[in-house]
């Protein structure tokens, strides 16, 4: 019984470590990884999974390490694409929030989101709607 409980918790943490690693990758792609971006990532992971709020620093630390060791985004997206479209849309929304956190939309950031959308089966139309939603929210 306890083994199963710990196994599920480990799976949950791994899921959020992968998501956080993708978000860290997006934050670093413009060569500037700010405290504001870290705060957005932490808040996003806490909002996605309320039970991990006490472990958020550990999750972010593991995600940063995973992102440094990885050489492709496929590793981060392969699990995320299995979840509902609403969940995947939320991930894209968080990515746009990270992109706009410094007030600019770098070409590398846009390209990354376009590639992630393809890997997560999010259409260009839905991506555009999500992008506009984030822009309106930040005004």
In which residue ranges do the predicted regions lie?
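Small-residue-enriched hydrophobic alpha-helices in membranes
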Residues: 1-139
């Amino acid at each position: 019984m306890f083994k199963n409980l710990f196994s599920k918790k480990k799976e949950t943490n791994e899921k959020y470590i992968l998501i956080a690693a993708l978000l860290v990758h997006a934050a670093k792609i413009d060569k500037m990884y700010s405290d504001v971006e870290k705060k957005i990532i932490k808040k996003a992971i806490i909002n996605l999974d309320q039970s991990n709020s006490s472990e958020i620093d550990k999750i972010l630390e593991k995600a940063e390490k995973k992102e440094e060791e990885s050489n492709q985004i496929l590793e981060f997206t392969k699990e995320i694409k299995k979840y509902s479209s609403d969940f995947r849309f939320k991930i894209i929304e968080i990515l746009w929030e990270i992109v706009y956190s410094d007030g600019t939309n770098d070409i590398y950031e846009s390209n990354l989101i376009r590639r992630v959308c393809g890997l997560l089966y999010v259409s260009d139309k839905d991506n555009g709607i999500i992008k506009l939603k984030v822009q309106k929210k930040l005004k």
